[in-house]
């Protein structure tokens, strides 16, 4: 019997269980979202019936297949648990069927069965259904593990209240800030809080000394470490480097920590202040924190979605004043915070006005606690979502929207339950019509945003402050009179050079000497080697010229077609082939021309080889998803694929080189069949979001795509025609206006 094999298998089992839990949660969320969208769109079934069929089929097929696999998994769990049962006493103490044992290990070995029952009743994962009492023994292990890491924190608060009545009395705040409701929302933070806070001294480790008699609190830091923990800490101390605490991570983006929330003069304090306020530690810990006992590891996106946020403070189609908390250029988003009167308790924690209990062990994954920033002298709320591959943990500052690395030797504190349950201040915001990279200069200032979309998790907004749209001033270089910047750029332009004089003069290196025989004799029309010579027997070009040239191909003999000219003001027939936007479509004139399409039999494999690599703007034959080839023009080139435009239908695709074939001159010189048509009287709505744009395109597809109709040519545009719909389609512009997809053109 090898215990190392069992340990490795157990580690693999735990890792797979965490992945399974995360996948089940994300899958359930996605299916509920699809079901919600399907239910909402059923009210417009007459308009979107065709587009709802694939959505309905996908939902039914996916749920059926996943349900089958889940049922098989439950059966396998039941079979395997029946086969590995221990003795009666041992099984009751260690089995996963015993809810008390798992909850006891996840919540610091609480031995009260009543507390364990409260936990099981008050917290369970969203994807686990309620089972009857007769089948409670078959509840998967997921339900037990998740009981200690749920977002609600209700079960944890119940256990904490039942542990000891001593914890019910929360120490009163030692310094109270003045009323902040009188501040103007357009002022920055330092103007709001200036002069309203008492100075708080910074000292050694936190111990509530002034209220020991009335409010004793048992500190988890006072518990002696076990022999296993001591050996673990001793091994880690060999590579531990004492820095300045978590501030090394937070200070990389310290602009998201307002300077006014820091203590300006921590050394200039009176004796009365020192006696009044308990000192907080400023330096990092000398030993590592114990790892979390429970919880579920999640991704960065999942931990953000799990945390409670006050999304109701940002209603749609309104202008809201908020603080720009941080900017994430890599994810192309920003985080905004309201910081209104409902966050006063969070501000007191941030300003170190509340006595907190220091912890020696990290809370469960997903649990909210506080951490000390020793450089900025602030305490902020934080949660850890997963362990890092290189050591430490991935953590998330819930009030500033920053993901940081947590070493495990920081100074952390336990938060009161009421502060834990307060919504997170940082809310993800996808800003449109602005450059995210230029938003760093507005961090920690109030900005006004127009909220276009609020999906209860993320905002889609647009900044409306004038200074955000002002161009940044750049230092211009003064040039002598009469010389412009373009002239100086032309003078300073130095092309790539070469040390080969032939390549510098001709642009290439001739290969005459490598190709022509040096012993060629015109009288013999050969050389002394006879037929054994492998070089070309011809004279060199006179005067050092070269014969190494490539002849251009002759012009093809073909008949060029001309485009049909249509008179402005006439009524013509068109076929809509592609919807390019809310007010623009692509189509063909119905002039009786046969369609330009090639079957795979017309383009066999031996005809799909290019003599040279295709270049930009070349006309080629491109394979479409229906198995046929159509004319296309190369408009961009990438390492493994090409971006092409179907010149006869108007759609754009990305295809590899294997899906392209040469197009003969007789076909490539024919005029493009597709034209751009703009709808008269309307333009794209300024407030149209990306999601609304997709909805508008789907709506126009159901109405216009692959439809032949008569239209009135109103005007010739540089890139197409301005048309007016007739007959059954004349109400299309009005319907687009009613749905807020477009607005009246001026």
Swiss-Prot record:
Residues 311-489 are annotated as: Non-canonical tudor domain. Residues 613-670 form the Tudor domain. The keyword Cytoplasm applies. Its main location: cytoplasm. One of its GO terms (molecular function) is zinc ion binding. The keyword Transmembrane does not apply. Keywords: Cytoplasm, Differentiation, Metal-binding, Oogenesis, Zinc, Zinc-finger. Widely expressed in female germline cells, including differentiating germ cells in germarium and egg chambers (at protein level). A zinc finger (C3H1-type) spans 511-540. GO terms for cellular component: P granule; perinuclear region of cytoplasm. Disruption phenotype: Females are sterile due to defective oogenesis; defects in germ cell meiotic progression and loss of dorso-ventral oocyte polarity. Oocyte nucleus fails to form a compact karyosome by stage 3 of oogenesis. Precocious translation of osk mRNA prior to stage 9 of oogenesis, probably due to defective RNA silencing. SMART domains: TUDOR. It is found in: Cytoplasm; Cytoplasm, Perinuclear region; Cytoplasm, Cytoplasmic ribonucleoprotein granule. Residues 1-310 are annotated as: Involved in homooligomerization. GO terms for biological process: negative regulation of oskar mRNA translation; oocyte dorsal/ventral axis specification; oocyte karyosome formation; secondary piRNA processing; transposable element silencing by piRNA-mediated mRNA destabilization. It comes from the Eukaryota. Belongs to the Tudor domain containing protein family. Homooligomerizes (via N-terminus). Component of the ping-pong piRNA processing (4P) complex consisting of krimp, aub and AGO3; a single molecule of krimp can bind both aub and AGO3 without the need for homooligomerization. Interacts (via canonical tudor domain) with aub (via N-terminus when symmetrically dimethylated on arginine residues). Interacts (via non-canonical tudor domain) with AGO3 (via N-terminus when unmethylated on arginine residues); this interaction leads to symmetrical dimethylation on AGO3 arginine residues and its subsequent dissociation from krimp. Possesses two tudor domains, a C-terminal canonical tudor domain and a central non-canonical tudor domain. Both tudor domains can interact with Piwi proteins allowing the simultaneous binding of aub and AGO3; this brings them in close proximity to facilitate their role in ping-pong ampification of piRNAs. The canonical tudor domain possesses a hydrophobic pocket that preferentially binds methylated aub; the interaction requires symmetrical methylation on at least one aub N-terminal arginine. Stable structural component of the perinuclear meiotic nuage, a germline-specific subcellular membraneless ribonucleoprotein compartment involved in production of transposable element-repressing Piwi-interacting RNA (piRNA)-induced silencing complexes (piRISCs), which are essential for maintaining germline integrity during oogenesis. Scaffold component of the ping-pong piRNA processing (4P) complex that recruits the Piwi proteins aub and AGO3 to specific subregions of the nuage where it coordinates their activity in the ping-pong amplification step of secondary piRNA biogenesis. This is Tudor domain-containing protein krimp.
